[in-house]
């Protein structure tokens, strides 16, 4: 039995956005840490910190909202490549998300990066998720 921590993280963030929660706790793994760093770097979240409880560790993400109505910065967060169906792309065929307004997070041979970085470095890889 395998467990998809990336899909869990995406579901937790989407649910927290719908509840307009300020903070959300996601499982800490190497891949989720890289995804969280990209979300912070691209301005989708305010901050994050690592919390350890006994044998498990988590990231506490501080989500970003706009204005008085608290519109979430993350409009959509979708898992693309799944354990049951892996999706790969070379750098020329990586699609621009909403004409460059969103990002694709890609796992390449040089690590996890955004679609823009992958195109600049001319690297293809597994398309993990889309965020806008």
From Swiss-Prot:
Q: Where in the cell is it found?
A: Plastid, Chloroplast
**What's a Pfam family in this record?**
Ribosomal_S8
Alphabetical GO biological process terms: translation
Write down any Gene Ontology CC term.
chloroplast
Q: What role does it play?
A: One of the primary rRNA binding proteins, it binds directly to 16S rRNA central domain where it helps coordinate assembly of the platform of the 30S subunit.
**Database matches in PANTHER family:** 40S RIBOSOMAL PROTEIN S15A
Know the name of this protein? Small ribosomal subunit protein uS8c
């Amino acid at each position: 039995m395998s467990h998809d921590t990336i899909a869990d993280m995406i579901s937790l963030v989407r649910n927290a956005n719908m509840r307009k929660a300020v903070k959300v706790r996601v499982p800490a793994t190497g891949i989720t840490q890289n995804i969280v760093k990209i979300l912070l770097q691209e301005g989708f979240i305010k901050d994050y910190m690592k919390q350890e409880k006994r044998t498990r560790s988590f990231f506490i993400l501080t989500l970003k909202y706009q204005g008085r109505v608290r519109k979430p910065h993350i409009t959509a967060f979708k898992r693309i490549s799944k354990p049951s169906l892996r999706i790969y792309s070379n750098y020329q065929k990586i699609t621009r998300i909403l004409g460059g307004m969103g990002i694709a997070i890609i796992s390449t041979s040089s690590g996890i990066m955004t679609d823009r970085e992958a195109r600049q470095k001319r690297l293809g890889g597994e398309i993990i998720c889309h965020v806008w």
